[in-house]
Amino acid sequence: MTVRPRLAVGQGIDVHAFSDDPARRLVLGGVDLTGEGVGGLAGHSDADVVAHAISDAVLGAAGLGDLGRHMPDTDPQWRDADSLDLLRQVVSLAADAGWVAVNADCTVVAERPRLAPHVDRMAELLAGALGAPVNVKATRAEGLGALGRAEGIACTAVVLLSGDDGTAARGPGDGEVR
């Protein structure tokens, strides 16, 4: 007898405008891109839209709400927090609820800086925090809207989680024990 895994998909999105603070660091997917020709993003934590989108996707798949519910921007303990640490905490919350990450896929939308040279390192750092493979893609808004005018950066993410629903699987194609 085998146990049938349960699967859940979560979606996340995060958007931050560029900060007016010239000293603000730009962190995306855990990679510090300060000095790449743009300022940092405005936000309570380090404003890493990539880590935030993946965190929201994990929480959504696990049925645990969103990042703001667990780590509100009104709480001083999250001020300038490392978003990879936040992602690790989210993964722990999901694990406590019986879930583990299978993989994640995300798309960063930014006119600048140029992200192609950094996506592999982002994927590596994010995978370390998530405990599962992460694919990172970058695209541009091609001049359309606030993102196209380079007023900020956005990221969308999808995460697959697996858990154990405790039911015995029987029958062909359903994990039959022979």
Regions found by a protein language model. Give the residues of each.
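Short, conserved loop-to-beta-strand elements that form functional interface hotspots
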Residues: 103-148
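Active-site His/Glu-centered metal-binding helix of metallohydrolases
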Residues: 50, 54, 58
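General beta-strand structural signal in soluble alpha/beta enzymes
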Residues: 7-11, 135-138
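Glycine- and Gly-Pro-enriched alpha-helical subdomains that act as flexible
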Residues: 57-100, 111
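C-terminal edge-of-domain segments
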Residues: 149-168
